[in-house]
Each structure stands twice: as structure tokens, then as C-alpha cells.
């Protein structure tokens, strides 16, 4: 990878602006999952250990741009970092006109999405952010697919722009899957909609040996094959696309196994009774909410044969315990496998957290959209600008 790394630069005494992805779930002012914070801490600590004056940027949630909303404030994140770092930590709301920060000190800036022009990559905003630093470090893989002021624009105008350790780790893990994967490769792609993962599914059939669809995606494939799926979630306008993917998979030698039995309910609720049914017995008023025990066994066997595993999305409504058996079994099978495994996407990470399997997956990606776009073979804008800056440095 043609990138300058943070570790290549002498940070001592320099103002170092780090873009992290600290977009964590917060309920009643409390952080409910610190996974992204734990992933970012080593980068921040390394910069501080090396004598830098550190400023951290991040977004949180989806506020109306340019408008302050307390529930989207990064103040709880600053409190968390204060408790988890042995360095002074300050939280600053107004930072665009400059930040007073000393070596060995961390300043956490308020949500970048409170700034008008962030999403549109406004040039004036990007230049103000760039003026805060001597070195810009892009470490937020989760937002690397967005060309925004705090991810792309600032990297254009900062005196030096480099890749952070977390970003490098993410790209290296994905390269292991994309460039030289050990076969057979099994991909599990779950979630509600085929439409949101259409490009990914088409890309994967030409790359993997087995593609296991789950959730609403599997329902669309089942309906496309003429199976009764009752009132289950599916996308009627994508049935032809699903058929095309099945034909494409056959041409490419990619197996797409579909459920032979399912777990159904009559309503989408936590208290809804669950019933195992063979696919041929699904009724008109049934809702498919998980895979059945026979399908679980088949999928687990396929996972155990893999040397590389890609996991994005649950195979059932795992938030409801009676419909969680499929996702749990898949997660445990991946964790128990000796294969190189990479997992990404919000729901996937929630499942990994729920079943306490963080240490047993080879690599857990902090990215959702960025993870998918990498798997689709797309170039991430925030990585592209770092590569461009690296080229420029090397020719001077």
C-alpha cells in the first residue's frame, strides 16, 4: 500500500489532528458499547506517548448538520477517554478558529457534523480543520468511504497527511481476503434487503466458493425460486436480480445454499411464539424470522470446511431470543474455525458482542459501509487522497 504511516513521522512537539470513528451508541448519556473506542485508543495513546499535542475529531450519530443537539454530543466520549488515558483530556466545543493544546495533552473536539459543510466537503471548513495541525492522521476506517471535510478535505490541505495504525490494520485485513485468500472461501451475507447489498452479492459470486444469504436477503432468493414465504420480508422488485445472481453463481462455480427449514412466527415481536417448519410447510400468514436446525447444521458444516470466512449480517432476527439460534450457531462456528475470519457491519458486531466472541474472530472491522465498499472492490476516497499525498511527498 502506497501510504505514509503515522509511525513513519516524528510527532514530537507537533500538533497532530486524528480523525477517529468514535460513533458509539449512547443511551441516557451512557456509552452502551465501547468497541470503537477500544479500537481507537492505541492510536491516540501512541501519538501522546510520542510527545504530540493531540486533537481528535469524530462524528456521532446523524444530527441535522450545522445544528447542535445534546444527544449527539461527543462529551460522553471525552469523559470515557479521560478515564482510559493517563494524559490530560479536554473537551472543546468551538475549535474552528484554533485550539490551544500542548504536547502530552488531548483535546476532543465536538461532533464534526455540527459544522455546516461537513458532509459536502466544504473547502473553507476543510481548510480550517487543516489549520489546526502540523500532521493529519486519518484513522477512521468506518468513514473512509465518505469524501467529507473531516475525512477527505482536511487531508488535501493539511501540511502532512498520513494513515493511522487502525486504518492500516483494517486495510491489511481486507487485503488478506481480497488479494490472496486461502480457499475455500465462505461468505455469509445477511440483513434485510438485497438492494443494499446488490453490488456486494454480485462481486462475491465471482470471488467466493460458497455464498450463504441470510435474513430478508435469503427470503428474496427463496421467493425468486418459487417458494412460499408467507408474509416474510422480501423485495418483490428484485426477484429478477436474485435469479440473475443465482445464474451468475452457477456460471462462476459459486454455491448459494438456501434454507431447507425455517423458524416462523405470526408477528414481528419479542413475545411471538416460534415454530420450526420445513420450507414446504410455510403458511400464507407465516413470517420467516430465522433458519431452522437442519439448515443450521448444513451451514455450520460449510463454515467448518472454509479456510477464509467473510461475515456481514445476521441470518435471523437475533434481537429476539426465540429467533436467535441461527445467528448464534453461525457466529460460534466462525469463532471455532481455524480459518482466517473477518466480520464487519453494525448488526454483525452487535452479534459478536452479544455472544462474547470478540477474541475468537480473526479480524473485526469497525466499518459498515466502508467494509462493504472494500469488499465490492471500490476505492475509498479518504484512502485515495492519502495515497495521492504520499505520491506527492515521494516526488519532492
Swiss-Prot record:
PROSITE patterns, sorted: PGLYCERATE_KINASE
Q: Which residues bind ATP?
A: 197, 319, 345-348
Q: Quote the Pfam families the UniProt record gives.
A: PGK (PF00162)
Q: Which GO terms describe its biological process?
A: gluconeogenesis; glycolytic process
Top-level EC class, please? transferase
Alphabetically list the UniProt keywords.
Answer: ATP-binding, Cytoplasm, Glycolysis, Kinase, Nucleotide-binding, Transferase
Q: What pathway is it annotated to?
A: Carbohydrate degradation; glycolysis; pyruvate from D-glyceraldehyde 3-phosphate: step 2/5
Q: Name one GO molecular function term.
A: ADP binding
Q: What is its EC number?
A: 2.7.2.3
Q: Name one GO cellular component term.
A: cytosol
Which compartment or compartments is the protein found in?
Answer: Cytoplasm
> Superkingdom, according to UniProt?
Bacteria
Q: Which residues bind substrate?
A: 21-23, 36, 59-62, 113, 146
The record's section on InterPro entries has:
Phosphoglycerate_kinase, Phosphoglycerate_kinase_CS, Phosphoglycerate_kinase_N, Phosphoglycerate_kinase_sf
**Catalytic activities:** (2R)-3-phosphoglycerate + ATP = (2R)-3-phospho-glyceroyl phosphate + ADP
Subunit structure comment from the entry: Monomer.
Q: Would you identify the family this protein belongs to, as annotated?
A: Belongs to the phosphoglycerate kinase family.
What is the protein name stated in its UniProt record?
Phosphoglycerate kinase
| Gene transcribed to yield this protein | pgk
Amino acid at each position: 500500500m502506497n501510504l505514509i504511516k503515522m509511525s513513519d513521522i516524528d510527532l514530537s512537539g507537533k500538533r497532530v489532528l486524528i480523525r477517529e470513528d468514535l460513533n458509539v451508541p449512547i443511551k441516557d448519556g451512557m456509552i452502551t458499547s465501547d468497541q470503537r473506542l477500544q479500537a481507537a485508543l492505541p492510536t491516540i495513546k501512541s501519538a501522546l506517548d510520542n510527545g504530540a499535542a493531540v486533537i481528535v475529531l469524530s462524528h456521532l450519530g446523524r444530527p441535522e448538520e450545522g445544528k447542535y443537539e445534546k444527544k449527539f454530543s461527543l462529551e460522553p466520549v471525552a469523559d470515557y477517554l479521560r478515564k482510559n488515558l493517563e494524559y490530560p483530556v479536554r473537551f472543546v466545543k468551538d475549535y474552528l478558529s484554533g485550539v490551544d493544546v500542548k504536547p502530552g495533552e488531548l483535546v476532543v473536539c465536538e461532533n464534526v457534523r455540527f459544522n455546516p459543510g461537513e458532509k459536502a466537503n466544504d473547502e473553507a471548513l476543510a481548510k480550517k480543520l487543516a489549520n489546526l495541525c502540523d500532521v493529519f492522521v486519518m484513522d477512521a476506517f468506518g468513514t473512509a468511504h465518505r469524501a467529507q471535510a473531516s475525512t477527505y478535505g482536511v487531508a488535501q490541505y493539511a501540511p502532512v497527511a498520513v494513515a493511522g495504525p487502525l486504518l492500516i490494520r483494517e486495510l491489511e485485513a481486507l487485503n488478506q481476503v481480497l488479494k490472496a485468500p486461502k480457499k475455500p472461501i465462505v461468505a455469509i451475507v445477511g440483513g434485510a434487503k438485497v438492494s443494499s447489498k446488490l453490488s456486494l452479492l454480485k462481486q462475491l459470486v465471482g470471488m467466493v466458493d460458497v455464498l450463504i444469504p441470510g435474513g430478508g436477503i435469503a427470503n428474496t432468493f427463496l421467493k425468486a425460486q418459487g417458494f412460499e414465504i408467507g408474509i416474510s420480508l422480501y423485495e418483490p422488485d428484485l426477484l429478477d436480480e436474485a435469479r440473475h445472481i443465482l445464474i451468475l453463481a452457477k456460471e462462476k462455480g459459486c454455491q448459494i445454499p438456501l434454507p431447507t427449514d425455517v423458524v416462523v412466527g405470526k408477528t414481528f415481536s419479542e413475545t411471538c411464539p416460534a415454530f420450526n417448519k420445513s420450507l414446504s410447510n410455510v403458511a400464507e400468514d407465516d413470517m420467516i424470522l430465522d433458519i431452522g436446525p437442519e439448515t443450521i447444521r448444513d451451514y455450520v458444516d460449510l463454515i467448518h470446511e472454509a479456510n477464509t470466512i467473510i461475515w456481514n449480517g445476521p441470518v435471523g432476527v437475533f434481537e429476539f431470543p426465540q429467533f436467535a439460534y441461527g445467528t448464534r450457531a453461525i457466529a460460534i462456528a466462525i469463532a471455532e474455525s481455524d480459518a482466517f475470519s473477518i466480520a464487519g457491519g453494525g448488526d454483525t458486531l452487535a452479534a459478536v458482542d452479544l455472544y462474547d466472541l470478540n477474541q475468537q474472530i480473526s479480524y473485526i472491522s469497525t466499518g459498515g459501509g466502508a467494509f462493504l465498499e472494500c469488499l465490492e472492490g471500490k476505492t475509498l476516497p479518504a484512502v485515495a487522497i492519502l495515497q495521492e499525498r504520499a505520491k506527492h511527498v515521494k516526488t519532492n
